[in-house]
């Protein structure tokens, strides 16, 4: 439910709407969403991608961009719905392939026009996913990106 609450907030739902949906107080919603953003004590893991099918969490991907490492957790036994299928310990190359698989092809006709419409200066799968939530025509899977507030405490002087 924590991921669903964070996803609803990202989709523009108000805290009050989310609270009504889950029949909890607004304070509970605030606390749960804050919890969703505190997913790692590792200061190098600043981003988590939640790969969902509709509203069902399928895979979480904790990302360490500095050391080019990822750690995943699958939440479904349905292999086609997992971010990396049967691969239990994906590499950085697997991760970059996954990102590219959730975007339009780099070689697509009028790619520059599409990027311009998106407000992006160049083709970068991560930036595209931040704009599109990794949604693709023909499937109902998408990506929720969470930034780790816990990791920022060590670097944020405020």
Regions found by a protein language model. Give the residues of each.
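Short alpha-helical "recognition helix" segments of helix-turn-helix
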Residues: 17-22
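Key DNA-contacting residues within the recognition helix of helix-turn-helix
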Residues: 30-31
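Phosphate/dinucleotide-binding and metal-coordinating scaffold of catalytic cores
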Residues: 35-158
């Amino acid at each position: 439910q924590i991921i669903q609450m964070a996803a609803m907030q990202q989709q523009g739902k108000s805290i009050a709407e989310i609270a009504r949906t889950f029949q909890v107080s607004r304070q509970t919603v605030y606390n749960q969403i804050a919890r969703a953003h505190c997913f790692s004590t590792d200061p190098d893991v600043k981003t988590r991608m939640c790969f969902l099918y509709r509203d069902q969490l399928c895979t979480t991907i904790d990302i360490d961009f500095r050391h080019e490492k990822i750690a995943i957790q699958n939440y479904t036994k349905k292999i086609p719905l997992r971010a990396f299928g049967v691969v239990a310990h994906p590499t950085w190359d697997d991760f970059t392939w996954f990102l590219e698989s959730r975007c339009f092809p780099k070689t697509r006709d009028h790619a520059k026009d599409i990027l311009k419409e998106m407000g992006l200066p160049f083709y970068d799968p991560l930036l595209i996913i931040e704009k599109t939530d990794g949604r693709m025509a023909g499937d109902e899977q998408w990506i929720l990106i969470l930034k780790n507030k816990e990791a920022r405490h060590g670097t944020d002087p405020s």
